[in-house]
Amino acid sequence: MPLPNNYEYAGSSDPNHGNKYRMLSNEQKDLLALALTYGYPNRVGLQTSKDANACYAATQLIVWQITLGFRTSPTELNDKSYPVSGYSGTMTEQHCRNKYFKAYYDAILADMASHYIRPSFAVNYAGAAPVYEMEYANGKYTLTLTDANGILSKYYVSQSSGVSVSVSGNTLTLTSSKPINDAVTIKLNRQIPVTTMSTGFLIWSVPGKEGANQDMVSGVPGENDPVPSFLKVRTAAGLSLIHI
């Protein structure tokens, strides 16, 4: 994705001297990471060249909005760009008149906005995880939890602590053949999209010729936050059975 030429280089013989990315705030870097995570070419389901082109252009615009300081969150934008000669509206308004572009633009921003939403029954810290009780029935201990936030389908189980755990839509089902007297931790992580074109995070520039070239950014930052989410389970008190 091209980065706008709104930052100056300090000038150095060191090929790693570019400071455009370094000059971004931490908030901008976080937003940029999300845009690249859910945008082109990391976005899953690009079936045609029309899809790829629209997704590429939408990702590029969002990157520009972030690095120019126009976008402060997935839902907050103050586009201060001027209309191109012969056209009306801001840079964002002009691009969003194309329905194919707008579809991917909206989808990328929606995924960015929901990235840090956790299932309603889980929290972000294991030490504060709520404890749920599994009930005994039909020879096993079970528990079913429904996610009121509607985001569970975008998570996977990364730690089960010996409990059988499955995700189906917005329903989490936990099963154990043995009693669990001391609560154990269940950990869920956000699914990060990956395609055959996904790469590591890179900033591209031409050292010594920065003024005549536009910097590029590609790939997905390796420190992408999987949004770990925690809950704990145990078997209901008084229901521990002696197996002979």
Where do the PLM segments sit?
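Short, aromatic- and glycine-rich surface loops/edge beta-strands on solvent-exposed regions
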Residues: 181-206
